[in-house]
Amino acid sequence: MEVILLERIAKLGQMGETVKVRDGFARNYLLPLGKALRANASNKARFEAERSTLEARNLERKSEAQKVAESLDGKSFIIVRSAGETGQLYGSVAARDIVETLAAEGFNINRNQVDLNQPIKAIGLHTVTLHLHGEVDVAIEINVARSAEEAERQAKGESLTSADAIYGVDEDALKPEDFFNPEAEIESEEE
């Protein structure tokens, strides 16, 4: 099916272009969301008549998205979840959880704007891309930890998945006199 794009769509085309897409993609995504029109004579004439208003609306949306992107750029958000000793989460962090965290901070982001290939299933620092507009993307850092204290330690660069990070290091056990002495064992075998 041929459609006229009403906005820029990644890997498809720019606003105003006539492109050929699969019927299901057009019927289930592009047409219902108002991102495209069927490419026929009446819709082409309608698009040309409304082109200036569509371009103005697109520029307005883009400038709003750029303002949000500037305020989000480089920010880190903490999500606290239960996890095992190895850092594996009991559950996962999905796009919905990221949207809720951003909403708590005052950012209005939709779930479909979060680019998350798979749910996050381990503690640590994760970079997530937000598609705010067809031409505006921003990367944020999601800090998944077991507590706010661990999130601060993780942000400083500490690894929380090793046994030392979980249980702490016993400095007294590392003193040189407590290490294995091979000569002492040889003496006991000779007797």
From Swiss-Prot:
GO biological process per UniProt: translation
Record's function text: Binds to the 23S rRNA.
Xref: InterPro entries: Ribosomal_bL9, Ribosomal_bL9/RNase_H1_N, Ribosomal_bL9_bac/chp, Ribosomal_bL9_C, Ribosomal_bL9_C_sf, Ribosomal_bL9_N, Ribosomal_bL9_N_sf
GO cellular component labels: ribonucleoprotein complex; ribosome
Annotated segments matching region Disordered: 151-191
Superkingdom of this protein's organism: Bacteria
Keywords: Ribonucleoprotein, Ribosomal protein, RNA-binding, rRNA-binding
Name the record gives this protein: Large ribosomal subunit protein bL9
Coiled-coil parts of chain: none
Protein family per UniProt: Belongs to the bacterial ribosomal protein bL9 family.
Listed PANTHER family: 50S RIBOSOMAL PROTEIN L9
Gene designation: rplI
Any one GO molecular function term: rRNA binding
Keyword match Acetylation: no
Keyword Ribosomal protein: yes
